[in-house]
Amino acid sequence: MNRAREELDRYRETLEEVSSRFVDVATKARQRREDPKPEPEVMLATSIGERVEGLLQVENVADRLEELEEELGDREEATFRIVEEVIKGELKVKGDLPLHKRIDYAVRIGLAVLTEAVVSAPLEGIAAVEIRERGTGHRVVDESEPPHEEPKLVCTECGKEVDPENCYLAVKYAGPIRAAGGTAAALSALLADYARQVAGLPRFNPDDFDHDLVGRYVEEVVTYLDKVGSFQYNPSEEEVELVAKNIPIEIDGEPTEEVEVQGHRDIPHLPNQLRGGALLVICEGICQKAPKLIKRVEKYGIDGWEFLEKLVNKGSDDEEEGEEEKTKIKPNDKYMGELVAGRPLLSHPSAKGGFRLRYGRARNTGFAAVGVHPSLMYVTKGFIVIGTQLKVERPGKAACVLPVTEIEPPVVKLRDGSVVRLDDPREAKELVEKDEIEEILDLGEMLVAVGEFIENNHPLVPPAYCPEWWVKEVPDVVKVIGLRKNLPNDVFEKLKDVPLKRLVKEASRLSGNGNNLDGFLNGPVKVARSIVELVRKEVIPRLSSPERMSVEEAIELSREYGVPFHPKYTFLWHDVKPKDVDELREALEVAGSEWGNLRVEFENDGEIKRILEDLLVPHRLEDDTIVVEEPWASALLAQLGYDPESGEFREQDEDLDYLLDYLVIRDETCRYVSKLAGFPIREKAPTRIGARMGRPEKARERKMSPPPHVLFPIGIAGGNQRDIMKFHRGESEDTDRVEVCYRICPECDRLVPYRVCPFCGTETVQYCNRCDEPADECDCEEPDPVVRADIERNDDPYSSLPVRELVRRAEEEVGTTDTLKGVKGMTSRLKMPEPLQKGILRAKRDLFVFKDGTLRFDCNDCPLTHVRLKEVGLTPFKARLLGFERDINGDPVVSEDQVVELYPQDVVLPRKAAEWAVRVCQYLDDLLRKYYGLEPVYGVEKPEDLIGHLIVTLAPHTSCGVVGRVVGIADINCWYNHPIINAARRRNCDGDEDAFMLLLDVLLNFSRLYLPDKRGGLMDAPLVLTAVVDPYEIDDEVWNMDVCGDYPLELYRKALEYADAGEAEELIERLEDRLDLPRGLQFTHDTEAIDLGPTVTRYSRLEKMEEKLEEQLDLARRIRAVDESDVAKIVLDSHFLPDIKGNLRKFGRQKFRCSRCNAKFNVPPLSGKCPRCGGDVLLTIYPATATKYLEPAKRLVEEFGTHDEEWRTIASEVELLEEEAKTLFGSDHSVSLKKFFGET
């Protein structure tokens, strides 16, 4: 343990040292040139408190939060104390602030701490926290003099002073509050109310207003669900009304949709449009998370939230329905609701032939990722590949799918009638390539970690019977049989559930309570000791390699000791009826007289063939004969009760009921077969999981649309390609005016929109465009830092942008390029452009900049805790340099075949990303050398050279980057991350995608001044960097990931009883148990290789929708667990018909655009020409786009439209839509701009 601690400390020190070294390089570089600021604009943070300070630009929070956490022992409680201290002015986060600003900062800081200061919700999700006047909703501010001890509240509408007793608090939410998650969004409202109470403001009362505010909330939710979309939880109207009437603060919001309310309009302080952020807080926050809120309300003694009890009680009826006897779990078809054309359905809910649930976590699964056999990826024609997202029936909603070879593969029927189990992925690939698979009888097992059930609060369900369960169960069954044979029934009942290791002790305790002490003592204790000795000396040695046990050994073990049959050779008896078993016994013919050397033949009868296929018995056809060969022949005969020596079937063992009951074998056929065999036959696959394809895997460079090389405005002067070089060479006839930062070089006396003049090196001066005075001397109420300048040089040096001179200057320093794509205009507030030198160097490397000045690559997230060196291009020497000195068995690393445990911030890049990153490193070296005049730092020439370098990982909707270390390259189209760094970004692995950047790129090129000046502009930007991750300060979802090497027998027994997931928490080791030292993690299943399987989904390789749809239906025809007619119906209902309706509706309401300058028009000019540049004005939605799914829909109706009444209804709907299209466009489905307006 000391070694593990030392290694982890050394790893963290290295991350900190290298990060600091890169900060020094970036600081030195930026001080030399024209970057927006002379130092890196990303703050390196080591704790939540520091991240809060960097995110919200406040101070004194980090130290105080650390003190309170140490004092209170609870971060959430410390958060409420921070809120209180900020409002009271005891904690000064921005000097002396008036009351309304203290409240605003307090709520934002509180939310930032609750979200680990990773997401941008505290900045972007809360538009404002306002004090408002009761009855009017007018905003009220504190105009008292510093230090603001006695607030003076003044209405901003009329300027009158307002009594605090006549005020209330409102939180104005925006769309990005979604990034906080439901719990944090709900807690933000609770924090705001706590702030209100500390500030001494009255509670919000909707009855104070002349308008029906409660009805407004209800109408908004109903309208949103009807016209916009759905929430994770869709509350009833009664629930919304209950919240709206009783919430102590006003939940307000910015308009996020164009859709307006119809009934409750024109309320003075509210917009008519839907307020998506406010609705999300109510629905997914307060309503959905009411039970969690109640705990906080009680814990912190916050008054006014008693209505939450009624919210929770409304769900009690549903809970009562779930109190039935827990013997099964109902199929759940929610995952099928939005089936997309071209993305196949793999299994209907809980359908026979669907995925068989198996408990376990491989080194590349867990944290919402599941494992399937790589053969499955091939037999689905490559639709499902490494990193593809699946929408699943349970335990969660979605999962990333990854290859695991230590689970059972799919079983298929070939065109020659053979049934084959595809243990070898290479065989599966070959069969698919030759098109020899006729039907996929079974999809194989899906490996799901028990932690997923805990995290999703899903009841445990019976898993597939597997070797790791069997090997723990065998000794227990030997114990039970021994006790039953040798002890009275009352003693047996008392001892049967006692674990083997405590059996002798418990027997001794029981014996001490008997009247006949000698006889009783000799009985139970003697029996217990003999059983323990038998298990220790004879049984356990035979279980050393359960995966490699032969069928002869398995039969001998079960017949000798009466233990359940080995799961590898157990067939799916629960998928057939007892009468089917009798048919098999009557129809078979046996050749051979000893186990392991048998052959079973059946006449090629359709019913017998069906039964064998249902059982998943591998077999082949020889003329008119069905042949089952070893090892399956012996396995089948043993389970049917056949004795090869006598050539007869055994008599039924009617005395097995006690053992079958003890083992909770409920299925009628399994009980019947068990009695025939003379030993228990478990349900092989009691739980099936339905699934469909979700998002494809992804590994792709992030590009803006259209993609620029540099953030430099060129308007239309660069043509459609925005090519600055084209303008520079005089090849473009267009000119334009663009908005840029109004900075003047005092030395050159002209407009230079940079911090430092690139011509003379003088620091420029910011001017105000309203008064033409330096910003420092400006008296304007709202200074305007932007000037509209001519691209061409004019007579006024203050209003012309010297583009050609800037290009010439850049070419002198870094060379030239044929093409240099800029942007039409800057979207930031100051509109300060990037230096052109950076763009030229990017263009030379074929790299494209993102909105914040960085270069990014997007990948689907996949988890990885351990890696085999050769999988990722690591040599033993390189591995030792990275700190991997010993493998998982404690042996020194000397071979590429050894498996090592990753460190918490390690990542494995896909090759495509690594090749891109090589170009980025070369660009950064060029930048340092040619532009900044410094020595290069990377020296990277090939992907493997990236190993050991640091990157910055960033999730969408967040504002905190996390430093990661590259430890390998894999041939995949997703990336593997240690789950801890994934959780540090508040992301799991259910199909989410994140981005990475090179660390030096972020430090050199990122600037807040480039970010868009609009709501959400600060999202998806690395405002703060975490160099070293603290496992206590990450998304706690990952804490439930199991990190044990196996599961105890008790867990499987709990699963058979459908126990609550919480009962599993104490049975397995989870990451939460190792937060102090997250090393020594284990996994239950290994895989041959983390890159074994196809890597590019067929969905992406097929270009036409017709091809994708045909392939989807063809796969549906082949998979036994799927009904192709249902697939076609769902595709029409959830994809084609809504799209056709929406597109036809949008066509009539569309806007128009100029083909040349891209100007937008609600109503096009009568001339059809753009008044700005003379370009042609075009439609934005064309008839072909509006009707693109009409023909595929018609073909589906033609094929399936007469199946039932529901299909006939769909057929009528398609017919009506076709008539509507003809009315709009005519029979040729084409229309020009003139025709759109009815002109000839």
UniProtKB/Swiss-Prot annotation:
InterPro entries: PolC_DP2, PolC_DP2_cat_dom, PolC_DP2_central_dom, PolC_DP2_N. Its EC number is 2.7.7.7, 3.1.11.1. GO terms for molecular function: DNA binding; DNA-directed DNA polymerase activity; single-stranded DNA 3'-5' DNA exonuclease activity. The keyword Cell wall biogenesis/degradation does not apply. The keyword DNA-binding applies. It catalyses: DNA(n) + a 2'-deoxyribonucleoside 5'-triphosphate = DNA(n+1) + diphosphate; Exonucleolytic cleavage in the 3'- to 5'-direction to yield nucleoside 5'-phosphates. One of its GO terms (biological process) is DNA-templated DNA replication. Keywords: DNA replication, DNA-binding, DNA-directed DNA polymerase, Exonuclease, Hydrolase, Multifunctional enzyme, Nuclease, Nucleotidyltransferase, Transferase. Belongs to the archaeal DNA polymerase II family. Heterodimer of a large subunit and a small subunit. PANTHER family: DNA POLYMERASE II LARGE SUBUNIT. Possesses two activities: a DNA synthesis (polymerase) and an exonucleolytic activity that degrades single-stranded DNA in the 3'- to 5'-direction. Has a template-primer preference which is characteristic of a replicative DNA polymerase. This is DNA polymerase II large subunit. It comes from Methanopyrus kandleri (strain AV19 / DSM 6324 / JCM 9639 / NBRC 100938).
